Amino acid sequence: MTQITFKNNPIKLSGSEVNEGDIAPNFTVLDNSLNQITLDDYKNKKKLISVIPSIDTGVCDSQTRKFNEEASAEDGVVLTISVDLPFAQKRWCASSGLDNVITLSDHKDLSFGRNYGLVMDELRLLARSVFVLNENNKVVYKEIVSEGTNYPDFEAALKAYRNI
């Protein structure tokens, strides 16, 4: 079980750990229109999965913007996953000024968080993290940010994404 800190408080993450070299497990989340989405919906595309605790915080907002601005022109897809309600994600997307933002909600049953070992049970939030998957869903990059209020290593994640 991985342990991080969130606002300097120790938090254990629950769920199944996923590592570089693994085939990423499938998951079910909701899009902004309450449609069920799975990893299989992005078959044969490289993926940058940006995981945030909540879209309504400054760090999460910045992380979502940065990855979408830097990686959306690449031949692949950038997915931002949080436990925010789809309605909150839809509101954020409408006000963000960004095109092509894909936000997905793991609020319903934490399928993504549990399958990737990212659930902060005490807070019912997901740990800030980044996964890069190739077209065959092999994990080629993984970062779980050790302090949940800090930024991920944007450059390392983007380099891994671009090098697929």
UniProtKB/Swiss-Prot annotation:
Disulfide-bonded cysteines: C60-C93
Assigned keywords, A-Z: Antioxidant, Disulfide bond, Oxidoreductase, Peroxidase, Redox-active center
EC number: 1.11.1.24
Database matches in CDD domains: PRX_Atyp2cys
One Pfam family named in its UniProt record: Redoxin
UniProt cross-references to SUPFAM superfamilies, sorted A to Z: Thioredoxin-like
PANTHER family listed in its UniProt record: THIOL PEROXIDASE
Something else known: The active site is a conserved redox-active cysteine residue, the peroxidatic cysteine (C(P)), which makes the nucleophilic attack on the peroxide substrate. The peroxide oxidizes the C(P)-SH to cysteine sulfenic acid (C(P)-SOH), which then reacts with another cysteine residue, the resolving cysteine (C(R)), to form a disulfide bridge. The disulfide is subsequently reduced by an appropriate electron donor to complete the catalytic cycle. In this atypical 2-Cys peroxiredoxin, C(R) is present in the same subunit to form an intramolecular disulfide.
Main function: Thiol-specific peroxidase that catalyzes the reduction of hydrogen peroxide and organic hydroperoxides to water and alcohols, respectively. Plays a role in cell protection against oxidative stress by detoxifying peroxides.
Family: Belongs to the peroxiredoxin family. Tpx subfamily.
Record-given protein name: Thiol peroxidase
